[in-house]
Amino acid sequence: MNDTIAAVSTSSGAGAIGIIRMSGPEALTISSSFLFSKNKFLSPSEILPRTAIQCVFQIGDRKIDQILFFYFKSPNSYTGEDLCEFHFHGNPILLREALDAIFRAGARPAKQGEFSRRAFLNEKLDLTEVEAIGRLISARSRFELELAQKNVFGEVTRFTSNLRSQLISLKAECEAEIDFSTEDLTYESLEERKTRIENVKSLCQTLISKSSSAEKLIQQFRIVLYGEPNTGKSSLMNVLLGKERSIISEIPGTTRDYISEEIFLEGIPVRLVDTAGVRETTDHIEKLGIERSEKEFQSADVRLFLVDVSKKENWKEFINKSRERLEGSILIANKIDILNSSWDRNLFSDVKDLIVLEISCKTKEGISNLLDAIKERTGKLGHSEDYVLLEERQRYHFETIVRCLDKTLHLLKEGAPAEIYIQEINYALAEIGEVNGKVDTEEVLGRIFSKFCVGK
């Protein structure tokens, strides 16, 4: 890291501002050769750290742009090195010209993620925080963004620090027992030691479970609207989307294939699927649509089974015919605004794991209850503070820690001496080092930073 790197750190294309970032031992010297103010180029000694300098970026005698310049002196910068930022007007041609001049002056083009790599190597960030920055940049929903923010501010770092502290304490107790076995000292009982290990293992398992739930939410739940023609599936689709997406018609069979759209529930992306109405038909195209409806319904995370409550008469026959599909679904009794006679929702009391709701797509009655039921049915929609997000690499290491602790417990129960099972504790500690990058992780670093943009 003895050289100086530079890159555009804002997104490509025109914009109000375009930023060039430069980091390394020659960053300030190179920068000063372009900063023109009060009829002269600024010397490095005139440039104060953490101060906004309004000046002209000038190449020789050619003025390029009015800019703001910032200098962050090592080690108090993002990378831990001398770091400079040029804030231009965001024209890509202008930025390219300025960057080429910076390269000619002695900087080299930064590689993907090289600024963050230097921050990691200079211990400004640990590996989990670096990965969180990548997730922060690419987050597709508010939920994912909030989870990434938690990790940027050290959620996983604090967890691994606590985990490491507990395992080191456990290891110290075991080593004392080994080294001073002939001394008249009192140590914790085997049961107490087992309990401590179980507690640490439980912490890891809870973390993994929370991450799995979060990942499921990020990858999108599929909510499928299913039922006979003209039960209001397309109308409900439009109501939930807040726009006219599905074609609505009184003619049965209007929807021939499924239609899907993304909606957000409490900042969490959800895929909403409107399917073709299910009925007996001789139309080949409609049959194909119905087959797809069945497949979508069976693979759904949340199944909304719609019925037109104003027309349905033989409820017992309907229940007997549809029982298998009703189990685990949300039955939506639609069109209650035109219901002429009462209906008995208790008819469904013996259908396993069924929620029954009454709504009107026309008046919007019951829609808020439906949204609540969807959240209840998933059992996972909630606030980001209830979750933590692990990258796949991190999750692998935490799962390995659990296996090490399982083996430790097994050895304890078998009566193995501390000299044997302490090795498993050492393995678990090594895995913690892999999580936050406190070991030699060159290959891992290459994979992580290859996903970053050049200016990061």
UniProtKB/Swiss-Prot annotation:
It comes from the Bacteria. It comes from Leptospira interrogans serogroup Icterohaemorrhagiae serovar copenhageni (strain Fiocruz L1-130). Its EC number is 3.6.-.-. (6S)-5-formyl-5,6,7,8-tetrahydrofolate binds at R21, E85, K124, K456. Mg(2+) binds at S234, T255. InterPro entries: G_TrmE (IPR031168), GTP-bd (IPR006073), GTP-bd_TrmE_N (IPR018948), GTPase_MnmE (IPR004520), MnmE_dom2 (IPR027368), MnmE_helical (IPR025867), P-loop_NTPase (IPR027417), Small_GTP-bd (IPR005225). Exhibits a very high intrinsic GTPase hydrolysis rate. Involved in the addition of a carboxymethylaminomethyl (cmnm) group at the wobble position (U34) of certain tRNAs, forming tRNA-cmnm(5)s(2)U34. Its cofactor is K(+). The keyword Protein transport does not apply. K(+) binds at N230, S249, I251, T254. SUPFAM superfamilies: P-loop containing nucleoside triphosphate hydrolases. Residues 220-379 form the TrmE-type G domain. The keyword Cytoplasm applies. One of its GO terms (biological process) is tRNA methylation. It is an enzyme of class 3 (hydrolase). Gene3D superfamilies: P-loop containing nucleotide triphosphate hydrolases (3.40.50.300), Probable tRNA modification gtpase trme, domain 1 (3.30.1360.120), tRNA modification GTPase MnmE domain 2 (1.20.120.430). Homodimer. Heterotetramer of two MnmE and two MnmG subunits. GTP binds at residues 230-235, 249-255, 274-277. One of its GO terms (cellular component) is cytosol. This is tRNA modification GTPase MnmE. GO terms for molecular function: GTP binding; GTPase activity; metal ion binding. Keywords: Cytoplasm, GTP-binding, Hydrolase, Magnesium, Metal-binding, Nucleotide-binding, Potassium, tRNA processing. Belongs to the TRAFAC class TrmE-Era-EngA-EngB-Septin-like GTPase superfamily. TrmE GTPase family. It is found in: Cytoplasm. Binds 1 potassium ion per subunit.
